C-alpha cells in the first residue's frame, strides 16, 4: 500500500504543514512532524476533514472581505489629509513595538511585520475553530479589518525599512503569487502592516499584503515635525534598535524561504532510477574443460560464482569458487541449469604435420584463392643435363661450378616467362640422393623427367618415375642432348613406354618434348607445355592465411647461424613472423630469394632462404606459422623434447631374447665415423649411403653427424671414440686442424659423394691402398681483387703459411665451406711470372675457369703426393 508524507498532503490541500500535523494528531494519527508517513485511508480521512471545515465559499468570503478592506483603506487615506493623529495612538504604537520585539522570527515572517497579539490570537482561534459557524468567521473578519485600519493610521517605526524590502519583493512575480496563495488560506486574517502607495490602483486580484506602504501624507509631515524621521536608517535613538531588529528578521526570513524553496525543489526532483543488471541468457551448450572451477563455469554460462556454489550446495556438493570440479559434477550442474554439457577436445598443437594438413585442406576450400605459379621439379639420371637445362632457363652457369659436374643438393629457382612465373626445383640424380628426389616429388606440381637421347633410360630415371607416380604428379618428358650425333629419341620413347609413359602421338597423355639444353633447342616449347599443364590443373592458393611450407635444404652458416631454404605453399610469410620448422622454432629474421636479393615477404610457390631459427632443421620438415612467438616457442620446445625422448627409446638394452644378436654384433668390427657436410640433405644422403655398405664382419657406425665446418669438438669426439672424420664440401678450422695433427685424428675431405662411399667401402674390406695423399703446402688470404677483361679476376693475396706453387692445385674456402676446387692459372709477384711464392710475401694469381673471388676468401694450396702403402 502506497504511503504519503504530511508535507505532500499539506501541499495538496493548500494548508501549512503545522496545521496538517495538528489536525492529524487530533484525528488520532501517529505522526510526529511533516515528514511522517500515513496510508491512503488516513490521507482520505485527513483531506475530508479539511474539506468539511473549510469550504470554498468561506475562502471566497474572506477574500471579498479583504478586498473591501482595501477599498475602505483607500477611502480612509483620501480623507486622512485633514485629520491629525492622536497622541494616544503614539502610545499604542510603542506597545506594538514591544510586542513585535518579543515575537519570534517565524511569526514575524507570517504576519509580514504585524505586531498585534490580538490578530495572532484571532488567527490561532481561527485555526482551532475551523468548524465554527459562518457568522463567527465574519465577526473575526470585522475585527481583523478594525485592527488593519489602526495599523495603517499608526505605523511602526521600522516599517520604512520593510517598505523598501517589500518594494523590491514586488518586482518578483513568482514570490507575489506565493503571498497571494497565503492570503487565500486561513492566514489572511492577520492584519498586514504594509501601507498602500499613494495613487497606486488597488485590484481585487492582489491581496492587501502585496501592496507596498506609501509615504506619509503631506499633512502628516507638517504635523509639528513629529514622526518625520521615524524608521529611517539615519535615525538615532530607540528606533535604531528596531531598525536593526527588523533587518535581522528580514534576513532570517529570506534565509528560511530560500531553504524551504530548495527543499521543495529537492522533493520535486525525480529520484534516480536504479538500473537493474540484465541477466544474460544461458547458452545452449556448456563446453567445459577438465579441472574447471565455479568461476570458470560462471563466465561461460553468464552466472555469478556464488550462485553456482549455492546451486552445487543444493545438489549436495560442498565446494568453493576456486576448487576444481570433476567431469560428473560439471555435467550435473549443466543438467540442473537445463543446458547440454560437452567436454572440449584439446588439439595437440605440437603435431605440426597434422596442423599442416588441416591448413592445406582449409585453404583449398577457401573463397580467397588466387592463381599461383606452378612448382616444377626437374628429375632424371645423373649427368643427363638437368642443371644445364636450368642454367639455360635462368641464363646462369651453375653446372660449371659443381663438384664432379653433378648436383648434390636441391636448388630452388624462379623463372619468368612473359608475365608469368615458374618455380623450378633441381634435384640430384645420383643414387645416394633418393630421399631428395622423393621430397622433390612430394612438394611439386609437375615433374619434368630429363632423359639423355644418347644414353636412354637409367636406374635413377626409373626411380624418378616411381617417385612421381607415388606422389600422383603429372610427368613431362624432356629428351635432352638432341644436338649430339648419337641421339636416338625414338629409342628413348620406346623404353619409357614400358613404364606406362605413352606420348600423345601414340594415344597417351604424356607430353614429350625433344630439346637441347646446350643450344636452347625447343626450350621455349617446353616452357609453353609446362604452363599449359599448369592451366589445366588450375593451381590456386590463399595468400591471406598464415604461411605453411616445406624445407628444401638446411645448413649452418658462419655469421648467420642456421639457414633454411623453404618453399612457401600456402599463405604469406613475412619478416618477423613466428614459425616452427620441424623440431626448431624462431622468428623470421631475414629472407633472400633465389637471386640473392632481400625480400620482406614470400607468397605461395616462392622459394626463399630464411634465417632466425634456433637450430638447423631437417630436410623435408614442415614449416608452420603461429600467431605469437610464445606459442611457437612452446611448440618447438615440446617437439624437441619428444625427439629427444624418441632417440632415447631407440637405445636397445640386452635381454634374454636379443642376447645372441648382441653378442654377434659385439664380435663385429665397427668403422666409427664423424660425418660433417655443408647442407642437411647431403648429411642424410651420405649417412644412409654409408650405412647401406654391406661387408661381412664390418659395419659402419656414424657416431655424430652435422652441418658446418669441422671444429674442435668434432676432433675431440673422434679422438675419444677412435674414429675418423669425413668432411663433405667442408673444411676444418685452423684450430681443429692443428688439434687433429696433435691427437693423430684422420680427417678425410670429399666433394663427390661416390668417392667417399668407395673409400669407406675399400677401408671396410681392408683393400684400401692409398696411392696418392693430399698434402697442403700453403695458405693464402685474399686482400684485394681486380677485374681485367680477357683475363678474369686477379686475386691480390698474402701468403700466410707455407708456399704457393704455380703448378699446384688450389681450393677456395669461404666461411668454412668449399666454393671451388681447381687449378692455378697464373702466379705473379709484382709484374713477373714466378713458379712459387713463399710465406710472408704478396702475390697475384688467377684461377682457371673461376672468377667469383671476394676479399676475405681463403686459398688452400695443395699437391697430390704419392705415398707408400702401409
UniProtKB/Swiss-Prot annotation:
Subcellular location(s) per record: Cytoplasm
Residues covered by region (G1): 380-387
Ranges for region G4: 480-483
Chain segments carrying region G2: 405-409
Binding site for GTP: 380-387, 426-430, 480-483
Region of interest called G3, as start-end residue ranges on this chain: 426-429
InterPro entries: EF-G-like_DII, IF2_II, IF2_N, P-loop_NTPase, Small_GTP-bd, T_Tr_GTP-bd_dom, TF_IF2_bacterial-like, TIF_IF2
Region described as G5: 516-518
GO molecular function terms listed in the Swiss-Prot or TrEMBL record: GTP binding; GTPase activity; translation initiation factor activity
PROSITE patterns given in the database record: G_TR_2 (PS51722), IF2 (PS01176)
Pfam families noted in UniProt: EF-G_D2, GTP_EFTU, IF-2, IF2_N
Start and end residues of each stretch annotated as Disordered: 49-284
Family, similarity comment: Belongs to the TRAFAC class translation factor GTPase superfamily. Classic translation factor GTPase family. IF-2 subfamily.
Role: One of the essential components for the initiation of protein synthesis. Protects formylmethionyl-tRNA from spontaneous hydrolysis and promotes its binding to the 30S ribosomal subunits. Also involved in the hydrolysis of GTP during the formation of the 70S ribosomal complex.
Protein name: Translation initiation factor IF-2
Native species: Lactobacillus helveticus (strain DPC 4571)
Amino acid at each position: 500500500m502506497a504511503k504519503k508524507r504530511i508535507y505532500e498532503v499539506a501541499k495538496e490541500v493548500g494548508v501549512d504543514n503545522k496545521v496538517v500535523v495538528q489536525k492529524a494528531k487530533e484525528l488520532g494519527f501517529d505522526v510526529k512532524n511533516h515528514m511522517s508517513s500515513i496510508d491512503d485511508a488516513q490521507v482520505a480521512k485527513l483531506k475530508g476533514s479539511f474539506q468539511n471545515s473549510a469550504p470554498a465559499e468561506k475562502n471566497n468570503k474572506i477574500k471579498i472581505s479583504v478586498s473591501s478592506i482595501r477599498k475602505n483603506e483607500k477611502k480612509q487615506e483620501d480623507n486622512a489629509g485633514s485629520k491629525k493623529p492622536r497622541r494616544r495612538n503614539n502610545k499604542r504604537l510603542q506597545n506594538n513595538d514591544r510586542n513585535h520585539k518579543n515575537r519570534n522570527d517565524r511569526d514575524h515572517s507570517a504576519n509580514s511585520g504585524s505586531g498585534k497579539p490580538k490578530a495572532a490570537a484571532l488567527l490561532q482561534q481561527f485555526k482551532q475553530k475551523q468548524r465554527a459557524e459562518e457568522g463567527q468567521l465574519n465577526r473575526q473578519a470585522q475585527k481583523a479589518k478594525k485592527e488593519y485600519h489602526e495599523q495603517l493610521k499608526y505605523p511602526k517605526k521600522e516599517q520604512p525599512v520593510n517598505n523598501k524590502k517589500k518594494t523590491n519583493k514586488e518586482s518578483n512575480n513568482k514570490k507575489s503569487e506565493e503571498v497571494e496563495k497565503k492570503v487565500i488560506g486561513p492566514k489572511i486574517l492577520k492584519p498586514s502592516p504594509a501601507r498602500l502607495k499613494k495613487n497606486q490602483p488597488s485590484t481585487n486580484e492582489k491581496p492587501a499584503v502585496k501592496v507596498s506602504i506609501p509615504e506619509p501624507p503631506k499633512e502628516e509631515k507638517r504635523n509639528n515635525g513629529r514622526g518625520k524621521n521615524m524608521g529611517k536608517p539615519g535615525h538615532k535613538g530607540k528606533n535604531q534598535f528596531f531598525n536593526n531588529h527588523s533587518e535581522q528578521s528580514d534576513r532570517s526570513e529570506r534565509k528560511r524561504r530560500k531553504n524551504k524553496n530548495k527543499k521543495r525543489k529537492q522533493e520535486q526532483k525525480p529520484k534516480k532510477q536504479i538500473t537493474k543488471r540484465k541477466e544474460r541468457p544461458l547458452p545452449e551448450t556448456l563446453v567445459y574443460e577438465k579441472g574447471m572451477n565455479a568461476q570458470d563455469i560462471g563466465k561461460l554460462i553468464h552466472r555469478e560464482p556464488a550462485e553456482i556454489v549455492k546451486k552445487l550446495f543444493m545438489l549436495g556438493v560442498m565446494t568453493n569458487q576456486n576448487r576444481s570440479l570433476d567431469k560428473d559434477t560439471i555435467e550435473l550442474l549443466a543438467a540442473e541449469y537445463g543446458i547440454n554439457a560437452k567436454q572440449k577436445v584439446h588439439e595437440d598443437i605440437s603435431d605440426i604435420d597434422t596442423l599442416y594438413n588441416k591448413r592445406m585442406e582449409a585453404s583449398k576450400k577457401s573463397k580467397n584463392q588466387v592463381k599461383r605459379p606452378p612448382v616444377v621439379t626437374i628429375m632424371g639420371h645423373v649427368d643427363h643435363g638437368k642443371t644445364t637445362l636450368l642454367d639455360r632457363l635462368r641464363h646462369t652457369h651453375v653446372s660449371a661450378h659443381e663438384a664432379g659436374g653433378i648436383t648434390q643438393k636441391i636448388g630452388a629457382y624462379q623463372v619468368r616467362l612473359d608475365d608469368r612465373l615458374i618455380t623450378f626445383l633441381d634435384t640430384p640424380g645420383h643414387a645416394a640422393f633418393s630421399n631428395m628426389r622423393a621430397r622433390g616429388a612430394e612438394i611439386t606440381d609437375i615433374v619434368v623427367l630429363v632423359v639423355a637421347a644418347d644414353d636412354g633410360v637409367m636406374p635413377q630415371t626409373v626411380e624418378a618415375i616411381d617417385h612421381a607416380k607415388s606422389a600422383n604428379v603429372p610427368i613431362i618428358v624432356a629428351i635432352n642432348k638432341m644436338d649430339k650425333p648419337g641421339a636416338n629419341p625414338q629409342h628413348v620413347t620406346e623404353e619409357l613406354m614400358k613404364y606406362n609413359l605413352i606420348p600423345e602421338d601414340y594415344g597417351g597423355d604424356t607430353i614429350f618434348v625433344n630439346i637441347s639444353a646446350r643450344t636452347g633447342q625447343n626450350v621455349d616449347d617446353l616452357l609453353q607445355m609446362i604452363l599449359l599443364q599448369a592451366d589445366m590443373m588450375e593451381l590456386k592458393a590463399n595468400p591471406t592465411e598464415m604461411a605453411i611450407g616445406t624445407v628444401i635444404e638446411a645448413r649452418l652458416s658462419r655469421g648467420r647461424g642456421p639457414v633454411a631454404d623453404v618453399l612457401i605453399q600456402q599463405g604469406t610469410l613475412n619478416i618477423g613472423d613466428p614459425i616452427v620448422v620441424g623440431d626448431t622454432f624462431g622468428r623470421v629474421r631475414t629472407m633472400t630469394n633465389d637471386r640473392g636479393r632481400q625480400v620482406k615477404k614470400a607468397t605461395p610457390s616462392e622459394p626463399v632462404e630464411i634465417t632466425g631459427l634456433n637450430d638447423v632443421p631437417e630436410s623435408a620438415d614442415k614449416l608452420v606459422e603461429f600467431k605469437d612467438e610464445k606459442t611457437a616457442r612452446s611448440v618447438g620446445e615440446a617437439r624437441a623434447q619428444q625427439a629427444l625422448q624418441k632417440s632415447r627409446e631407440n637405445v636397445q638394452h640386452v635381454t634374454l631374447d636379443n642376447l645372441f644378436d648382441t653378442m654377434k654384433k659385439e664380435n663385429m668390427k665397427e668403422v666409427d665415423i664423424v660425418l660433417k657436410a655443408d647442407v642437411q640433405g647431403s648429411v642424410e644422403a651420405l649417412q644412409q649411403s654409408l650405412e647401406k655398405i654391406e661387408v661381412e664382419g664390418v659395419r659402419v657406425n656414424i657416431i655424430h653427424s652435422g652441418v658446418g665446418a669441422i671444429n674442435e669438438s668434432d676432433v675431440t669426439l673422434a679422438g675419444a671414440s677412435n674414429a675418423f672424420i669425413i668432411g663433405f664440401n667442408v673444411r676444418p678450422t685452423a684450430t681443429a686442424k692443428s688439434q687433429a695433427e696433435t691427437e693423430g685424428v684422420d680427417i678425410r675431405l670429399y666433394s663427390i659423394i661416390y668417392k667417399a662411399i668407395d673409400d669407406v667401402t675399400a677401408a671396410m674390406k681392408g683393400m684400401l691402398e692409398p696411392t696418392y695423399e693430399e698434402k697442403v703446402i700453403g695458405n693464402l688470404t685474399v686482400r684485394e681483387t681486380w677485374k681485367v677483361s680477357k683475363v678474369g679476376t686477379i686475386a691480390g693475396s698474402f701468403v700466410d703459411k707455407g708456399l704457393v706453387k704455380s703448378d699446384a692445385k688450389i681450393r677456395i674456402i669461404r666461411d668454412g665451406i668449399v666454393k671451388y676446387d681447381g687449378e692455378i692459372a697464373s702466379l705473379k709477384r709484382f709484374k713477373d711470372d714466378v713458379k712459387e711464392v713463399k710465406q710472408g710475401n704478396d702475390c697475384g694469381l688467377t684461377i682457371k675457369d673461376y672468377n667469383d673471388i671476394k676479399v676475405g676468401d681463403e686459398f688452400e694450396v695443395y699437391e697430390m703426393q704419392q705415398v707408400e702403402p702401409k
